[in-house]
Amino acid sequence: MSLSAEQKGEIVKKHARTASDTGSPEVQVALLTARIQHLSGHFAEHKQDHHSRQGLLKLVSQRRKLLDYLKRKDRQRYLDLIENLGLRK
């Protein structure tokens, strides 16, 4: 199962730059991180689910690209985001 609407709303509210912000890199990375964490839990139980693992790798790649973009454009926002989400550099 994916994230519920309530969970997404909480993540958006926490990482949004303005009240109606849903598309900033911070929000997108936070949502991708939540989905990645959810799928990681799935793989602890279903080790042979290679099809979903391929989707996980795409999500990780997409998150990496967004983080690289944010790092190029505004390094301080990037550093704040990885600290808030607990991601390594």
Curated annotation (Swiss-Prot):
Keyword Ribonucleoprotein: yes
GO terms of molecular function: rRNA binding; structural constituent of ribosome
GO BP term (any one): translation
Stretch forming the signal peptide: none
Record's GO cellular component terms: cytosolic small ribosomal subunit
Record has Ribonucleoprotein as a keyword: yes
Start and end residues of each stretch annotated as Disordered: 1-25
Record key words, sorted: Ribonucleoprotein, Ribosomal protein, RNA-binding, rRNA-binding
Cystines in this chain: none
PANTHER family registered for this protein in UniProt: RIBOSOMAL PROTEIN S15, BACTERIAL AND ORGANELLAR (PTHR23321), SMALL RIBOSOMAL SUBUNIT PROTEIN US15M (PTHR23321:SF26)
Family under the similarity heading: Belongs to the universal ribosomal protein uS15 family.
Functional note: One of the primary rRNA binding proteins, it binds directly to 16S rRNA where it helps nucleate assembly of the platform of the 30S subunit by binding and bridging several RNA helices of the 16S rRNA.
NCBIfam families reported for this sequence: S15_bact
Subunit structure: Part of the 30S ribosomal subunit. Forms a bridge to the 50S subunit in the 70S ribosome, contacting the 23S rRNA.
Protein name: Small ribosomal subunit protein uS15
Organism: Alkalilimnicola ehrlichii (strain ATCC BAA-1101 / DSM 17681 / MLHE-1)
